[in-house]
């Protein structure tokens, strides 16, 4: 067990070492050394991914610490002590899966940016490494104060990533929307943390799980945390910043934003709001269902009207994340397990869709839907990759999203038949805009010979596209293993009801 503790510290150390190496290249290197920086960053990111997989294999059969068994965390380590604030890291299988998603997307982002980031590549890699490090801490830290610090710190590198390497003139407007929407929302969580500290003199999550707050205090704390996390998800009607941020972000920024950052809000709901404020969760359940169902229907209808390819996927992401929140608040193992699975699936599928859109944008320099048609005749491999990802986006059986949405609907039917009926109807709307989008850009008659000037996937793009499609199908066929991993910690959360 001690080996696992030091192993985790080693992962954290490797992240910082990678960042320092990249910084040294940036300071002392010349523009001719950009290729060396690319190879070095790719090596470190891939090495970190191998490390976390190795840790996953090692920890699979290791028992939990006895004094920490009720939380089903596999380990914890206290580093810093400041008043009653502890920098404590810990991990259960849910944290581990989100870390796997983070470390999986990091080398993918470097491959995507290999030719698409044309300037200041050194600074871009520094930004990406620090995003990875902050995400590592968000998924592992066990103190609310430090969670809040890292939760807000992620805005800084994302602000730089979109503001510097964004694609159009409105990128500054987009990053200000991203920054201020999420910052103002998180101030509510800060107020909630202050209320908690004034009440029990600690913000340690392990203590909070055993603390019984009064009902009225729970209502206040639930509202402060819920709306802070819903802005980050984002849930309707707090979603205004997301389509603009996606449109202006580079492909890598969209992959990170859709793949991991949108999961921070739902992760916070699962880790803090639902198990700690149980009574308030039941009290506000009608409000949550109403917001989620309105968001699903509204975003599905809005998606059909969009003309920008990135906005289509952005609104689809809002719809899927509303589905996730529906599952989290079913308070049964099927719904919550389906939500966790759908979060992981959405991280893969939406990242793959934004990658495909980035590929055609790099060639044709436009994302307007009406300029695309008949791409199957010039980009057949791209068309096949997009087809697999579109199938997963509509939750086709055999793909990853099907398992998550099916479990969510199964759990929702146990609680509210009407909500489950509306959520099921939204799947039809998702299929409508997804299939129409694919048919419009892939199978329509080729009317512009300009498209014939460009080739299909390059070798690097083929590797990235193949990985996305392979993981999507693998999750769809072998999803039972992922479900078995998260069952134990989910039963622990349900025990707090």
Curated annotation (Swiss-Prot):
**GO MF annotations in UniProt:** NADH dehydrogenase (ubiquinone) activity; ubiquinone binding
Question: Which organism's genome codes for this protein?
Answer: Acanthamoeba castellanii
Give Gene Ontology CC terms: mitochondrial membrane
Q: Which domain of life is it from?
A: Eukaryota
Query: Which top EC class is named for this enzyme in its record?
Result: translocase
State where the protein is found: Mitochondrion membrane
Q: Does the keyword Transport apply?
A: yes
The molecule here is called NADH-ubiquinone oxidoreductase chain 4
Which parts of the chain span the membrane according to its record? 3-23, 42-62, 94-114, 122-142, 144-164, 178-198, 220-240, 250-270, 276-296, 313-333, 340-360, 374-394, 418-438, 463-483
UniProt lists the gene as ND4
